[in-house]
Amino acid sequence: MAKEKYDRSKPHVNIGTIGHVDHGKTTLTAAITTVLARRLPTSVNQPKDYASIDAAPEERERGITINTAHVEYETEKRHYAHIDAPGHADYVKNMITGAAQMDGAILVVASTDGPMPQTREHILLSRQVGVKHLIVFMNKVDLVDDEELLELVEMEIRDLLSEYDFPGDDLPVIQGSALKALEGDEKYEDIIMELMSTVDEYIPEPERDTDKPLLLPVEDVFSITGRGTVASGRIDRGTVRVNDEVEIVGIKEDIQKAVVTGVEMFRKQLDEGLAGDNVGVLLRGVQRDEIERGQVLAKPGSINPHTKFKGEVYILSKEEGGRHTPFFNNYRPQFYFRTTDVTGSIELPAGTEMVMPGDNVTIEVELIHPIAVEQGTTFSIREGGRTVGSGIVSEIEA
């Protein structure tokens, strides 16, 4: 059966849920899909239950390629792709790939707890990876009888957001109960609809980088028997069309060429994929083992693999979940670019003995294998699975 075409008539926006473990991110995601399916029944709006979204349980072995649930839904005004990023600290890596895919996010905070360590961490990560627009959903308000307590929690959340340069005083805070809405309580269903109209209004339609040269960070690779190899990910910038020639850049010294033979989004065929779309790209002339997560698909000649660069970095303080001790010259952490970790060594500027948690500094980095980078590429510095710094490439050296 031919796949149905993907409808482009509404503006498309990528959002997601972030926040502390057990504060109700996944329940809210389920509530949004379920309430929209009840109130605005369309072919896109299908209810998803908690279990089907919760695709990344904490007890599952790590090393799953990606543990982020993607759901789609629409309001009267827009089409949304929604990412549910798991809450546990072990999945911060995922938060980084997930948050990088959001035009805006709903920060879920349980009214019973208020902001918790991962609330802070996710706000910080959002700031680092360029998620500029946050809306707060204070969940579980049905469990709090004291109006003053709710006001205090809201103030605390707003202060925390301001601390990380978000407009804490001005951004929208919606109080509700995802579980009650999911169970069909009309009052709380109305609040979900209010939340979605706030998302429609407050998160601006993203400026898509469609005019720039194609860059698509590869998140996952699989092969379709008889058709070829598919690389999937979110198009960072540019467009990809059937018959385009692309280059596969990074990890390996050599740049490989391939031809695009198909583009799909949400299992529907597209004529072209645009910046911001989560797509699967079918490639001719590439074996399944010749392309991997961490590489990028790019317009030929637009980006090269590099191992040496200068970067401006901020090293997280102990309070932000960073290191407790300084590091010295030749420190060898992992550098997390787009979808993958690469080990590299850090050279400090002349005269700098060491870098303390909370410092920012210009460093020279040498990676153990090349990555597609350019001036302005952002990265995180990680060690043993936790983020200890964030940075941006200021100058390419080799």
Curated annotation (Swiss-Prot):
CDD domains (alphabetical): EF_Tu, EFTU_II, EFTU_III
Binding site for GTP: 19-26, 84-88, 139-142
Cellular component GO terms, alphabetical: cytosol
Predominant location: cytoplasm
Residue numbers spanned by region G5: 177-179
Record domain tr-type G: where: 10-207
Enzyme superclass (EC): hydrolase
Region (G1): 19-26
Location(s) in or outside the cell: Cytoplasm
Cysteine pairings via disulfide bonds: none
G2: annotated segments: 63-67
Superkingdom, natural source: Bacteria
GO molecular-function term, one example from the UniProt record: GTPase activity
Catalytic activity: GTP + H2O = GDP + phosphate + H(+)
UniProt-annotated binding residues for Mg(2+): T26
Keyword Repeat applies: no
Spans annotated as G4: 139-142
Pfam families recorded: GTP_EFTU, GTP_EFTU_D2, GTP_EFTU_D3
EC number(s) from the headed UniProt entry: 3.6.5.3
Keywords, alphabetical: Cytoplasm, Elongation factor, GTP-binding, Hydrolase, Magnesium, Metal-binding, Nucleotide-binding, Protein biosynthesis
Family: Belongs to the TRAFAC class translation factor GTPase superfamily. Classic translation factor GTPase family. EF-Tu/EF-1A subfamily.
Subunit structure: Monomer.
Function: GTP hydrolase that promotes the GTP-dependent binding of aminoacyl-tRNA to the A-site of ribosomes during protein biosynthesis.
Protein name in the entry: Elongation factor Tu
Record organism: Streptococcus agalactiae serotype Ia (strain ATCC 27591 / A909 / CDC SS700)
